[in-house]
Amino acid sequence: GSLGEKYAQKAAEVLTSIIP
């Protein structure tokens, strides 16, 4: 659902933030 998508998007954002 939207929750899963929201979580995935947040995780991707954090990952990209950590890994340049």
Swiss-Prot record:
UniProt main location, coarse: secreted
Keyword Secreted carried by entry: yes
Places the protein is found: Secreted
Designated name of the protein: Venom peptide Ocy8
GO cellular component: extracellular region
Keyword Secreted: yes
Tissue expression remark: Expressed by the venom gland.
Superkingdom as given in the UniProt entry: Eukaryota
Keywords noted in UniProt: Secreted
